[in-house]
């Protein structure tokens, strides 16, 4: 399982 979290302002 692969989880990608990305946050951008």
UniProtKB/Swiss-Prot annotation:
This is Unknown protein 23. It comes from Pseudotsuga menziesii (Douglas-fir). The lineage of its organism: Eukaryota, Viridiplantae, Streptophyta, Embryophyta, Tracheophyta.
């Amino acid at each position: 399982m692969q989880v990608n979290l990305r946050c951008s302002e």
